Amino acid sequence: MPTIQQLVRTGRTQITKKSKSVALDSCPQRRGVCTRVYTTTPKKPNSAMRKVARVRLTNGNEVNAYIPGEGHNLQEHSIVLVRGGRVKDLPGVRYHIVRGALDTSGVAGRTQRRSKYGAKRPKEAKK
């Protein structure tokens, strides 16, 4: 435990919070270009073919970003919007692609949680 004189001399050091999405440079989202679109398998207890894209951001960083939802239209050279948010069972994937923004289409046939997937309101739901 420090003495009062030691605290007067140096003071307490503040614990700084480390960012979990470093490549975004403190921005909420970043634009980028897909350099590779591929599928990969998750960690041990889970089994699937997860859709992932390698994206070069406008600040020069290159990141792996997850493509959420069922089906997508992304290919190489597609312009996408990238937000933070990791995928727990995919190591190295710490970003998500925003559906319904720029070149990324929304999820077709989505009726619930539509705003998360860029889906328009279906016609038959209106009364």
Curated annotation (Swiss-Prot):
Pfam families in the cross-refs: Ribosom_S12_S23
Q: Name one GO biological process term.
A: translation
Single GO MF annotation: tRNA binding
* Region called Disordered, residue ranges: 101-127
**Residue runs in coiled coils:** none
Show the PROSITE patterns listed in the entry: RIBOSOMAL_S12
Indicate the secretion signal residues. Answer: none
- Spell out the PANTHER family in the cross-references: 30S RIBOSOMAL PROTEIN S12 FAMILY MEMBER
* Record protein name field: Small ribosomal subunit protein uS12
Gene symbol of the encoding locus: rpsL
